[in-house]
Swiss-Prot record:
Enzyme class: translocase
Single Gene Ontology BP annotation: methylation
Entry-linked Pfam families: MtrH
Sample GO molecular function, one term: tetrahydromethanopterin S-methyltransferase activity
Swiss-Prot/TrEMBL catalytic activity: 5-methyl-5,6,7,8-tetrahydromethanopterin + coenzyme M + 2 Na(+)(in) = 5,6,7,8-tetrahydromethanopterin + methyl-coenzyme M + 2 Na(+)(out)
Entry EC no(s): 7.2.1.4
Keywords, comma-separated and alphabetical: Methanogenesis, Methyltransferase, One-carbon metabolism, Transferase, Translocase
Pathway: One-carbon metabolism; methanogenesis from CO(2); methyl-coenzyme M from 5,10-methylene-5,6,7,8-tetrahydromethanopterin: step 2/2
Identification of the protein by name: Tetrahydromethanopterin S-methyltransferase subunit H
Keyword Transferase set for record: yes
């Protein structure tokens, strides 16, 4: 496909490497657990869930990674400080190395999670999700005081969804912020910024989302990713059309997985692929594209890192 002239940063969190030239490293896959209305959760406020079912889901992802060579990260979503602490406790009990995103719709919950990870000594595996234009000072203060050094930096510009708008929000500010998000991240003590290009709906900036991947990597040299599956879930036509079909999921899933593959070809280093239940569908598809990217990288003179475990070697 292509090779960037600019040096591409490679960051490591919990043994997982993010960044580099397209095809140099296997694409990182980020699952989501304990999301809103996740069927394994019985009480979202107290963090009560089916531990056996959760572990089965997690072990499936581990097995798929072993088969393909694609590394993985877990996105832990909590709606209260109590629930997210319980989810983190469960995760670090069953897995002692894998990095995880701490995520919530509430800033005070994200802040509490960053503080908790510091207290229990796992901040080196935690990735704050996210530093964005709506972040409040209270969250900034706690994140700064924490030991968390990795964060998703969101390139969401509410007033300008273009590629320029995404770069502006990262570098100079906008949407009510007088500082760029990268500066805010640096002031919070973030040493590992992972750019989320903020996937926009089809017809409302989806093209700019994909184009921003190589643009941001080319200009800033930072690892780039996103929750591209949101393009499919926000597609009004598809939502309506699938309901008219005998097997709505069969209609929906190719589009869901496909959004990730398009972004991957454009240079995305990591994919927040959504519910962990989709793990068996996404891993083989992403590994397939990684083989193509790996072959191209070799032709362009890029040395494949850990070639033995890369899909281009392992699966061919």
């Amino acid at each position: 496909m292509f090779k960037f002239d600019r040096k591409q940063e490679v960051y490591e969190v919990g043994g997982v490497k993010f960044g580099g030239q397209p095809g140099e490293y296997p694409t990182v896959l980020v699952s989501t657990m304990f999301y809103a209305r996740h069927k394994i959760v019985t009480d979202e406020d107290k963090g009560i869930f089916d531990r056996a079912a959760a572990e089965t889901l997690w072990n499936t992802q581990v097995s798929l990674s072993d088969a393909t060579g694609n590394p993985y990260v877990n996105q832990i979503v909590g709606e209260t400080p109590e629930s997210i602490r319980k989810y983190i406790d469960w995760f670090i009990e069953i897995d002692d190395k894998t990095p995880f995103l701490i995520d919530s719709s509430a800033g005070e919950v994200r802040a509490a999670a960053a503080q908790y990870c510091t207290e229990i000594g796992v901040a080196n595996r935690a990735i704050h999700n996210s530093i964005n234009a709506s972040i409040e000072q209270s969250e900034i203060d706690i994140l700064t005081e924490s030991d968390v050094e990795a964060a998703i930096v969101l390139a969401f510009n509410a007033t300008d969804p273009t590629v320029k708008g995404k770069l502006d929000i990262l570098e100079v500010g906008g949407s009510g912020q007088t500082k760029g998000m990268l500066q805010v991240a640096e002031e919070c003590g973030i040493k590992i910024p992972l750019i989320d290009v903020a996937a926009m709906p089809l017809g409302a900036g989806s093209g700019a989302t994909i184009r921003s991947i190589p643009t941001i990597k080319g200009k800033l040299g930072l690892p780039v990713g996103g929750g591209y599956h949101n393009m499919a879930s926000a597609w009004d036509w598809l939502r309506k059309f699938k309901k008219t079909q005998p097997d709505p999921k069969a209609i929906y899933m190719p589009a869901d997985i496909g959004t990730n593959l398009v972004a991957q070809i454009a240079g995305s280093d990591f994919l927040l692929y959504g519910p962990i239940e989709n793990v068996e569908k996404v891993f083989p598809a992403v590994a397939m594209v990684d083989i193509m990217l790996g072959e191209t990288a070799k032709e362009l003179g890029v040395e494949i890192a850990d070639s033995e475990n890369h899909p281009v070697t392992r699966l061919t």
